[in-house]
Amino acid sequence: MKKLLVFMMAISLFAGCVTDKDDEVMGKDLKIAVTVGDEQTIYPSLLLGIGLTTAQSDEEFDVFDVVFKSKVKGNVKILFEATKLNFETIVTQSGCEEGQVISPRIKWDYDQLAAVRSPGLVDFTVICYVDNIECDRHNLRVNYRSVNECVYIAINQETDEVYDFTWMFGAYVNENHTKIDPFLQKIISNGIVTNFVGYQRDDETVMDQVFSIWHELQTRGVTYSNVVMTSNPSNGVGSQYVRFFDEVLDNTQANCVDGTVFFSSILRKIGIEPILILIPGHMYLGYYDVSGASYFLLETTKIGGLNLKEITSGNAVQILRQYIDVWITQQEYDAFVKGQITLNDMKNGISYRSFLDATDCNVDSHISNSEKFGNVLMYRFLPVQELRQIVQPIENATTKSAKTYSSELFKDLGKVKGKARKSLQR
């Protein structure tokens, strides 16, 4: 049974000086000393994402270990008092052996963990009882991080073993978010698509649905924001700041991970299966075609390359002139100036061309990296449908059933679709 030491807080229980002939400690003489592991940090995102999930059958994610340093008879009880992050937790057993380890499953307050948006400190009080007599108590001050900090890699400081947590990005994909339905209704009202049908038709319809999301975000003026670093001083844990669905929508800002999990949330909602594609320092989106054997790519950071919100009837002639030979031709621009093409059609057209560019731009590098996915650290191909077997949306962590991780997941990449169409005609 492996233990992730970088997340473990060790609580050592040791004996007083009074012993009997069997080297047992009298219950009243059992004392506790509290020591904290290297990290001394709680990551709410990790606790929420795996709250009801066993990530691997040979790994545990308990935060605390209790180690008994002496043999004791009687009924032993370890009590963790309630804090702002957890409910009172009690572990009991009959006697203890020297060196015995127990791992209390703390009763976390998942609603409070989900509300943690900035780092802080929390004091745990741990009390030891033998036969209902308090023997000792200690306070443990622990750091906690923002729920926006996604842990994606950890290193055991004692063994240098690396733990891959990239699947935790799936916890930020939330297909059940309450703001998705109003967002989809707004798209339909704009007329880019008349409804969302998932895979019920053909690949053209699938792409049109994805484009309608792209177009709406450009209409809202969503920009690229390279906010990825956190204030986490850890040398043993790699984490990245990830915005939730409502934060991207309300703040109209997204980095590569934000945009990818945002799109993935909507695609899952409308019945299109997304893929989180991770390479060192970057993430981009994939989504399956109707057959389920091939997939398209999408570079979500390119959304911010075109701000449709800033193009108005008053400045369109000036702004669109800058797009000649980039998103429009000279002939199309001249036709617009003459009133032969409407402003709405021009905006839809340049948005679609930017969408096709974002569809194409990663194809060649993706194919060249295909053998690295799943075999080289930080190259990961993560279908969200399969991620749901090991991690749930953070806001829904307490309502899902536990699943078991399969090491065979994420092996078959399938076939990436080739170059996209380049015409304004759709």
Task: Name each model feature, range by range.
Residues 2-7:
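Sec-dependent signal peptide recognition
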Residues 20-426:
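A structural boundary/capping signal
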Residues 14-16:
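C-terminal motif of bacterial Sec signal peptides marking the signal peptidase cleavage site
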Residues 10-11:
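Short, linear, compositionally biased motifs with a strong N-terminal bias
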